[in-house]
């Protein structure tokens, strides 16, 4: 089949969209927006987009043939048939205003994802934590089984070198975003819920019951013959299960899970465990990821794959050979310092539960190492709403370098900034954190902090990920390096 024939076949899956030729993305540099744009470029659409800065996502889209504008302007949308907008974009953005004046349809990211999913076998992964890893594991499993899925993920799948890919099969595996409740646009065949915690509460008016009900509604978007795969270990998920009127498969470490993990052991970056499934043989598995939280993510993938009759051999191989996701406990190398060798790991987790899971994985895999964390809080509202939880979890490391809050466009909130959080942790009495007012100062502080054998963990959803890579490239700012193993 030629490339043109493949485009025509894929385009025919959504025949009404053949009237649409030019699609413009406002905020195209985000992982979610860029992933959908990449799929559409490869389907043969003329894709353009704008963002305030160039990044790896925009660079990749340029190479694929998309037209990228750095900066927003009314002229960018003049030729568009439809405009896709990120939730981070202000309604007063000149491109949004121009699209309205020109009567160009404006859709949210999740609406476009829903159109891609409409005539495919959709697998949607939702939950407060673990979405990206679970989506990546499912995509890897289906790929290993020869199913060649389309996928859209919120992080870089290392084995593919991208966060999105257009496959040739009917499968679409995608992360479902609850942050703005837009995941309610999706109508998949299989839905996964990893866990439910209080986050993005501004979307839900501060009402946790509303958040829980929204997850129930998400699961009821499944057809009556669809499947809900849910983590029974999560107390809130277990609580809402009686309200779910769809076929359910549960997973977890709990004795009553349909897909259960047993005999968990962690050694360094890898975990071993046995999976028990109803009506199937037990499997002894090696997972090339650290931590019990990642075993839960793997169980979700196993449950989805088993339900779709994917062979056990593909499950075994995909989990053992999984190459990880960018910024999810990503090992960036080992570096020499004047006081000895230090290991550098970078992680995206920015909710207290995510930080706790990362710390637990680090302690389990490297129990003899001193844990030094450089943490950058993400959003003033999250810091305010989960302030006491942050104090508790950040007090669990051996040494804390606390950066100022990454605002993500929010206005500062008194008492919810990095300096206040640092002071509160110090008053707790377990730790004497070091406040880092500017990210540029981190490299200056490290020589006085790091000791031989330390595990340096950079943590957060802001620009600390880029900072961590700068540190790796400069060998933590020291002139001599030990064996450096920077991984993609």
From Swiss-Prot:
Q: Where does ATP bind?
A: 127-133
Q: What is its EC number?
A: 6.3.2.8
Catalytic activity reported: UDP-N-acetyl-alpha-D-muramate + L-alanine + ATP = UDP-N-acetyl-alpha-D-muramoyl-L-alanine + ADP + phosphate + H(+)
Q: Which GO terms describe its cellular component?
A: cytoplasm
- One BP annotation, GO: cell division
Cell membrane as UniProt keyword: no
Q: What domain of life?
A: Bacteria
Annotated GO MF terms: ATP binding; UDP-N-acetylmuramate-L-alanine ligase activity
Q: Which family does it belong to?
A: Belongs to the MurCDEF family.
Protein name as annotated: UDP-N-acetylmuramate--L-alanine ligase
Source organism (scientific name): Shewanella sp. (strain MR-4)
């Amino acid at each position: 089949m030629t490339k043109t024939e493949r485009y025509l076949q894929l385009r025919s899956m959504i025949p009404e969209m053949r009237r649409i030729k030019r699609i413009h993305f406002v905020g195209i540099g985000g992982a979610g927006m860029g992933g959908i744009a990449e799929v559409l470029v490869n389907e043969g659409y003329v894709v353009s987009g704008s963002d305030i800065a160039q990044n790896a996502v925009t660079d990749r889209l340029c190479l694929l043939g998309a037209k990228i504008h750095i900066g927003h302007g009314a002229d960018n949308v003049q030729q568009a048939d439809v405009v896709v907008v990120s939730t981070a974009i202000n309604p007063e953005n000149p491109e949004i205003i121009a699209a309205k004046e020109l009567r160009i349809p404006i859709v949210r990211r999740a609406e476009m994802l829903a159109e891609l999913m409409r005539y495919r076998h959709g697998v949607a992964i939702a939950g407060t934590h673990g979405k990206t890893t679970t989506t990546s594991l499912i995509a890897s499993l289906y790929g290993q089984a020869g199913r060649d899925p389309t996928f859209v993920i919120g992080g870089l799948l290392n084995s593919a070198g991208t966060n999105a890919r257009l496959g040739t099969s009917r499968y679409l595996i995608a992360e479902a975003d609850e942050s703005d409740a837009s995941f309610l646009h999706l109508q998949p065949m299989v839905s996964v819920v990893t866990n439910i915690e209080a986050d993005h509460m501004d979307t839900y008016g501060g009402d946790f019951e509303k958040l829980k009900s929204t997850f129930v509604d998400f699961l009821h978007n499944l057809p009556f013959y669809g499947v809900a795969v849910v983590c029974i270990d999560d107390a809130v998920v277990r609580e809402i299960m009686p309200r779910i009127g769809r076929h359910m498969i549960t997973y977890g470490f709990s004795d009553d899970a349909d897909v259960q993990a047993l005999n968990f052991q962690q050694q360094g970056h890898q975990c071993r465990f046995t999976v028990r499934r109803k009506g199937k043989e037990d499997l002894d598995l090696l997972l090339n990821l650290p931590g019990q939280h990642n075993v839960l993510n793997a169980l979700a993938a196993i449950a989805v794959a088993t339900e779709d009759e994917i062979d056990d051999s593909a499950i075994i191989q995909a989990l053992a050979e999984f190459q990880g996701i960018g910024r999810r406990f990503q090992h960036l190398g080992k570096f020499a310092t004047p006081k000895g060798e230090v290991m550098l790991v970078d992680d995206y987790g920015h909710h207290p539960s995510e930080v706790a899971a990362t710390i637990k994985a680090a302690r389990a895999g490297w129990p003899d190492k001193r844990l030094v964390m450089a943490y950058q809080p993400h959003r003033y509202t999250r810091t305010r709403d989960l302030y006491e939880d942050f104090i508790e979890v950040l007090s669990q490391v051996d040494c804390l370098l606390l950066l100022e809050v990454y605002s993500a466009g929010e206005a500062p909130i008194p008492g919810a900034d990095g300096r206040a959080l640092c002071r509160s942790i110090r008053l707790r009495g377990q730790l004497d954190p070091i406040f880092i007012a500017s990210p540029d100062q981190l490299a200056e502080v490290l020589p006085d902090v790091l000791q031989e054998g330390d595990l340096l963990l950079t943590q957060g959803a802001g620009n600390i990920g880029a900072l961590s890579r700068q540190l790796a490239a400069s060998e933590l700012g020291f002139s001599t390096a030990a064996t450096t193993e920077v991984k993609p």
